[in-house]
Amino acid sequence: MNNEERLERQKNIRNFSIIAHIDHGKSTLADRILENTKSVETRDMQAQLLDSMDLERERGITIKLNAVKLKYEAKNGESYIFHLIDTPGHVDFSYEVSRSLAACEGAILVVDAAQGIEAQTLANVYLALDNDLELLPVVNKIDLPAAEPERVKQELEDVIGIDQDDVVLASAKSNIGIDEILEKIVETIPAPSGDPSAPLKALIFDSEYDPYRGVISSIRIVDGVVKAGDKIKMMASGKEFEVTEVGINTPKQLPVDELTVGDVGYITASIKNVDDSRVGDTITHADQPAEQPLKGYKKMNPMVYCGLFPIDNKKYNDLREALEKLQLNDASLEFEPETSQALGFGFRTGFLGMLHMEIIQERIEREFGIELIATAPSVIYECILKNGDKVIVDNPSKMPERDQIEEIYEPYVRATIMVPNDYVGAVMELCQRKRGQFINMDYLDDIRVNIIYDIPLSEVVFDFFDQIKSNTKGYASFDYELTGYKESNLVKMDILLNGDKVDALSFIVHKEFAYERGKALVERLKTLIPRQQFEVPVQAAVGQKIVARTNIKSMGKNVLSKCYGGDISRKRKLLEKQKAGKAKMKAVGNVEIPQDAFLAVLKMDED
């Protein structure tokens, strides 16, 4: 293909993604677009086609972004190439959304006709506007009995400033309005601007590892052309490779001769090391490099850390490999080795949030067959010591002693909660209980309120989302962003079993709640830890001070069962022997702790 043909083809390319709050019908709309452009054989069609992980199907959510090429014959008689980049909707995966948007010129904004605009809808709209994308608004699920499309159109105009005439009314499930959406994509979303004769610039927006072909990078070509056999260079790492294959996803991978401006496809170059093909990097030609790399997207830093330990200690190296492979597709996952007296060798692992943590744990157990014990998650605290040093604490067991600490700071988030009028009181009470500071409240219309609070991340991270949902019968929606650190009166609480500290059960708590948290936890552990041959005291301590204690009663073993009748001194001898044996056992006392006990630290708020 010469440059004129490439430029001609470029005019008919449209790159877009679909953004929406979780459950507003994004994956169903993607399915309908695939069907109506005849991109997928009817026999291959299945619900949530782009959600390729079993886990995504089971939970009905999108976790990984996915890119496909579609062909569309428009009503004006021209043939168009669409690249649809599917994105997740859950707040934990917002970095996946920002990666998808960096590869597009436009976005379809899907809003549920019954639910209206929700917190994450807004968060995603702001992301799209930051990337200068054209928005194509769609009100979905208009055939639901509870649908109020006119109210939602008005809301889109009032809250986001979208002209009501531009809104398409649709129902992805019933295939209503899909043809209009396809025509609107052609009309409203601009063609890619780029120069096929300029030096190559391609953005890596995703990558996966294949044991035979090495790293497969998903790329969007911004300038230039790339073919198999080209020598390429990664601009961030400076490493050079030879391209072995370029191709497109239809959703299956299909090799092609070349990728040019506006194309979204994949590239393989026998890259064996994960770090050499980092998401957000720019690919250029080794012999004629571009001067400036593309603006990547901001790296997402983990918000939550927890320890992952293999139940079978021999699988430590397998766990390292599993984490390395997952890290390739998931730039936000971080891990480093850690040892625990209670659990042996494992990794301190950083995640974006609790859903992200659950998904990674489930993937390790399913895809790599490694059974795990996870410790209670914690956030990152900053301690200023009396000697002026600053210490970052991502693991409660590393917290310096209280008498060395001058000040402790903890991360706060700005939480935006959209809630129906009737539940405002319940939500505000929950936020106060979670040490929240009230910032603002606006009425979006006569039924919905937007409440803004600053809340410590440690209070939000565990089950705040579930509690908001249960306090509002599932009607509230929630989004948050990190705002910075604030000074706080925090203490480290240790749990002692049989007089020994269990490092994996330590946690950091606000001083005001230390007593009740400690009391609730020891009571809970009493029910979770199986009874031993000897009595086991369970204590919660802050520094040297014990704030709560309970005992796990011993299992009585009847040593006299074999002693029929006979002399009392014989019975006494057996009982004395048992007593001595128990004392010895208690001295070496090794208490088996089940996995539930480590998670009990999280569940205290529910009591």
From Swiss-Prot:
| Pfam families assigned to the protein according to its UniProt record, in alphabetical order | EFG_C, EFG_III, GTP_EFTU, GTP_EFTU_D2, LepA_C
Q: Which organism is it from?
A: Staphylococcus carnosus (strain TM300)
What name has this protein been given in UniProt?
A: Elongation factor 4
- Detail which positions bind GTP: 23-28, 140-143
By its UniProt entry, which InterPro entries does this protein fall under?
EF-4, EFG_II, EFG_III/V, EFG_V-like, EFTu-like_2, G_TR_CS, LepA_C_sf, LepA_CTD
Q: Which residues form the tr-type G domain?
A: 11-193
The question of whether Cell membrane is a record keyword is answered with yes
Keyword Ribosomal protein attached: no
Catalytic activity, as annotated: GTP + H2O = GDP + phosphate + H(+)
Tell me where it mainly resides: membrane
Name the Gene Ontology biological process terms: positive regulation of translation
Q: What is its EC number?
A: 3.6.5.n1
Membrane topology note? Peripheral membrane protein
* Similarity comment: Belongs to the TRAFAC class translation factor GTPase superfamily. Classic translation factor GTPase family. LepA subfamily.
Compartments in which it is found: Cell membrane
